[in-house]
Design a protein with these regions (language model features):
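Helix-loop boundary and gating motifs at the non-cytosolic
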Residues: 2-61, 215, 219-266
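Short hydrophobic/alpha-helical segments at membrane-entry points of transmembrane helices
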Residues: 18-19, 105-113, 225-226, 311-317
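Intracellular juxtamembrane helix-capping segments at the cytosolic ends
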Residues: 37, 123-136, 326-339
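C-terminal transmembrane bundle of multi-pass solute transporters/carriers
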Residues: 64-68, 75, 79-90, 95, ...
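Helix-loop-helix hairpin linking two adjacent transmembrane segments in secondary transporters
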Residues: 102-105, 148, 152-189
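Cytoplasmic helix-loop-helix junction between adjacent transmembrane helices
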Residues: 113-154
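Helix-loop junctions on the cytosolic side of multi-pass membrane transporters
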Residues: 130, 134, 175-204, 283, ...
Length: 420
């Protein structure tokens, strides 16, 4: 039996290492930009609805462009595509930093930038995971996906440490640094091999057709249910991220530094979830693993709404990100493993399109917060919550998500029994 040496593992080769490091640097810039924009919007508007709308605008490009990016990623060289997208991200950030420096900004200008940033974010998310698979191949896709997601989380830790300190003093500096991060990540992958080992064989006459993904979904129950579950967790689970600045400020009475700390904590929890994927990546029952992770995430969202003290909030948020990180990685692994090699980009495009359901979750949270803040409730609610609106929204979302995941457990047999 041949020994598996470090040299035979794709993770120890230069192509994957350069991709991993590029993802880390890009993520540092992206998360730093997201934290900074969230802080600035809440500072200039002091409105929960404006913050939630900002997150909605960031996700809108996913609905519009994700399927097309998935098709393009199946047709062109993914290394070049990824490098170009990262470079375009750096250009946008540099221009926005100039606007902030000269104080030429308002809420509308910020929203235009957030939309542009959302375009870059969704395109990179699809392309980098497809390219990671090209390098590591189907045998190591679990570890490859987890490692690139780990790089993303480490980048988030870097961003969390610096972003809160920087944006509270200089609005333009975080965006200028993020522009440099994106530029470096774009350059870093250029020396990689022209063709990766597991890149799909392409027909030059092949043209992207929107009907292809519809045909795949019609005949692939696993991918279809995966996308439905993604929509469910996006609306009622991941949407808690949209009110993180509000939770830190109104529930915990924190400031920009505390928001940065919570960003670090989220990423640390995410890294634990990713390490579990790496350690048990050869486990075949990934569908069952995904459903358990989604259920754990559901309970954590519910209990986050009951967390009034710093310690309880930290423990629940940390646990929530262990489960959500596992879900995120498993979604991408199963999406690619459930289709043929030539359709991986389309599958990831369809999955990313499902992420576009996030704004509906933001809308639900916003409506609940508005209702609670508008109507004069008795002290029955106030005695359990520091900030009744956002906390009650998390309780309701968590409860609904628990029920929906249990229904999926019961009826989604093919996903539950899916083996990679």
């Amino acid at each position: 039996m041949p020994l598996i040496t470090n040299n035979s593992l794709p993770f120890f080769k230069k192509d994957f290492f350069r991709l991993w490091f590029a993802v880390l640097i890009f993520a540092a810039g992206t998360y730093q930009e997201q934290v900074s924009v969230g802080y600035i919007v809440y500072e200039i508007t002091n409105s929960e609805i404006h913050v939630i709308f900002m997150y909605t605008v960031r996700v809108i490009p996913i609905i519009i462009f994700s399927n097309y990016i998935g098709y393009i990623a199946d047709l062109v060289n993914r290394k070049k595509l990824l490098s170009i997208i990262m470079f375009l991200g750096s250009v946008g950030l540099f221009l926005f930093s100039l606007l902030m420096y000269f104080e030429i900004y308002n809420y509308s200008i910020i929203m235009i930038f957030v939309f542009y940033s959302g375009c870059i974010w969704s395109a990179v998310m699809i392309t980098q995971q497809s390219y990671s698979y090209d390098i590591v191949g189907p045998k190591f896709v679990s570890q490859g996906t987890a490692l690139t997601k780990g790089a993303d989380r480490i980048g988030g830790i870097v961003a969390g440490y610096f972003s809160g300190k920087l944006v509270s003093n200089y609005f333009h500096i975080p965006f200028l640094l993020s522009a440099l991060y994106h530029l470096c990540s774009s350059i870093l992958i250029l020396p990689n091999s022209k063709i990766a080992n597991y890149s799909p064989v392409r027909n030059n006459k092949e043209k992207p057709k929107i009907s292809e993904i519809l045909y795949i979904l019609k005949n692939n129950n696993v991918l279809l249910v995966l996308i439905i579950l993604t929509i469910t967790t996006e609306i009622f689970g991941f949407s808690h991220n949209s009110i993180m600045p509000i939770l830190v400020k109104d529930v915990l009475r924190g400031d920009a530094d505390d928001l940065g700390f919570m960003m670090i904590l989220r990423q640390l929890g995410g890294i634990i979830g990713i390490l579990l994927i790496i350690a048990f990546g050869n486990t075949q029952k990934k569908g069952l693993w995904l459903l358990y992770s989604a259920l754990g995430m559901s309970f954590c969202v519910f209990f986050l709404g009951l967390s009034n003290s710093n310690l309880i909030f930290i423990v629940v948020l940390f646990s929530l990100n262990i489960f959500s990180s596992s879900c995120d990685s498993l979604y991408q692994i199963i999406a690619q493993k459930s289709v043929s090699n030539k359709d991986r980009g389309k599958a990831l495009g369809a999955w990313t399109f499902a992420l576009g359901s996030g704004p509906l979750g933001y809308l639900i949270i916003g409506l609940i917060i508005t209702a609670v803040n508008t109507y004069d409730f008795t002290g029955l609610i106030n005695q359990y919550y520091n900030a009744p609106g956002p906390q009650l929204a998390l309780n309701l979302n968590g409860f609904i998500l628990i029920l929906l995941v249990l229904v999926t457990f019961r009826y989604a047999t093919k996903l539950r029994e899916f083996k990679s």
